[in-house]
């Protein structure tokens, strides 16, 4: 959030902080969640770039559309392993995976 927006919200009595602070997450928990969100976003972006529906991707992964939806939403039941394997099945290289992890908008 931009500084001006934070100031404006604080001036109106809103408490401005991070999700990490709000949820009381440790640094490790916060990093894990951020990694999962980046991979999930990367999966959605790559699927859309390939012109696939969630159902198409589910068939490719021998899974269900609802499972793909959970993967793209970063659902807690989805493992990092499954997200990475799914990205690889869509043709993501090691370099592209590292770009997704470093910068979610890069890949």
Which ranges hold each PLM region?
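Alpha-helix N-cap/N′ positions at the starts of helices
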Residues: 38-39, 63
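N-terminal flexible/basic segments that precede or flank functional cores
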Residues: 1-38, 99-107
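DNA major-groove recognition helix of helix-turn-helix/homeodomain DNA-binding modules
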Residues: 79-97
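Residue-level detection of the helix-turn-helix DNA-binding "recognition helix"
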Residues: 62, 73-75, 102
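Alpha-helical DNA-recognition elements
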Residues: 70, 74, 85
């Amino acid at each position: 959030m931009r500084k001006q927006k934070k100031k404006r919200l604080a001036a109106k009595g809103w408490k401005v902080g991070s999700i990490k602070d709000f949820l009381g997450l440790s640094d490790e928990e916060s990093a894990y969640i951020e990694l999962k969100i980046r991979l999930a976003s990367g999966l959605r972006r790559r699927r859309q770039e390939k012109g696939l529906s969630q159902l198409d991707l589910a068939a490719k992964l021998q899974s269900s559309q609802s499972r793909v939806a959970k993967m793209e939403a970063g659902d807690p039941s989805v493992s990092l392993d499954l997200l990475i394997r799914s990205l690889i099945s869509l043709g993501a290289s090691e370099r592209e995976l590292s770009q997704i992890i470093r910068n979610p908008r890069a890949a």
